[in-house]
């Protein structure tokens, strides 16, 4: 889990645009965040399996 200070820091608009980065809205993880959902891969998988993301289904082929 991310510290509260890091979540607040990421929410602020940086002085330079290239310093902006995404964090998971649920757990605060800074890596592998899907922009479309605003969630990291781990939270996305958990919520999809629980059926909390409408329209998201497990793919199979």
Swiss-Prot record:
<dbReference type="GO" id="GO:0006412">
    <property type="term" value="P:translation"/>
</dbReference>
<dbReference type="Pfam" id="PF00253">
    <property type="entry name" value="Ribosomal_S14"/>
</dbReference>
<keyword id="KW-0699">rRNA-binding</keyword>
<dbReference type="InterPro" id="IPR018271">
    <property type="entry name" value="Ribosomal_uS14_CS"/>
</dbReference>
<dbReference type="InterPro" id="IPR001209">
    <property type="entry name" value="Ribosomal_uS14"/>
</dbReference>
<feature type="binding site">
    <location>
        <position position="27"/>
    </location>
    <ligand>
        <name>Zn(2+)</name>
    </ligand>
</feature>
<feature type="binding site">
    <location>
        <position position="43"/>
    </location>
    <ligand>
        <name>Zn(2+)</name>
    </ligand>
</feature>
<keyword id="KW-0694">RNA-binding</keyword>
<keyword id="KW-0862">Zinc</keyword>
<protein>
    <recommendedName>
        <fullName>Small ribosomal subunit protein uS14B</fullName>
    </recommendedName>
</protein>
<dbReference type="GO" id="GO:0003735">
    <property type="term" value="F:structural constituent of ribosome"/>
</dbReference>
<dbReference type="GO" id="GO:0019843">
    <property type="term" value="F:rRNA binding"/>
</dbReference>
<dbReference type="InterPro" id="IPR023053">
    <property type="entry name" value="Ribosomal_uS14_bact"/>
</dbReference>
<feature type="binding site">
    <location>
        <position position="24"/>
    </location>
    <ligand>
        <name>Zn(2+)</name>
    </ligand>
</feature>
<keyword id="KW-0687">Ribonucleoprotein</keyword>
<feature type="binding site">
    <location>
        <position position="40"/>
    </location>
    <ligand>
        <name>Zn(2+)</name>
    </ligand>
</feature>
<comment type="subunit">
    <text>Part of the 30S ribosomal subunit. Contacts proteins S3 and S10.</text>
</comment>
<keyword id="KW-0689">Ribosomal protein</keyword>
<dbReference type="GO" id="GO:0005737">
    <property type="term" value="C:cytoplasm"/>
</dbReference>
<dbReference type="GO" id="GO:0015935">
    <property type="term" value="C:small ribosomal subunit"/>
</dbReference>
<comment type="similarity">
    <text>Belongs to the universal ribosomal protein uS14 family. Zinc-binding uS14 subfamily.</text>
</comment>
<comment type="function">
    <text>Binds 16S rRNA, required for the assembly of 30S particles and may also be responsible for determining the conformation of the 16S rRNA at the A site.</text>
</comment>
<keyword id="KW-0479">Metal-binding</keyword>
<dbReference type="GO" id="GO:0008270">
    <property type="term" value="F:zinc ion binding"/>
</dbReference>
<dbReference type="InterPro" id="IPR043140">
    <property type="entry name" value="Ribosomal_uS14_sf"/>
</dbReference>
């Amino acid at each position: 889990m991310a510290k509260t200070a890091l979540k607040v820091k990421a929410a602020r608009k940086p002085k330079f645009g290239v310093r902006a980065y995404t964090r998971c809205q649920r757990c605060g993880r800074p890596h592998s965040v899907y922009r479309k959902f605003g969630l990291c891969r781990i939270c996305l998988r958990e919520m999809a399996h629980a059926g909390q993301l409408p329209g998201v289904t497990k793919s199979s082929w």
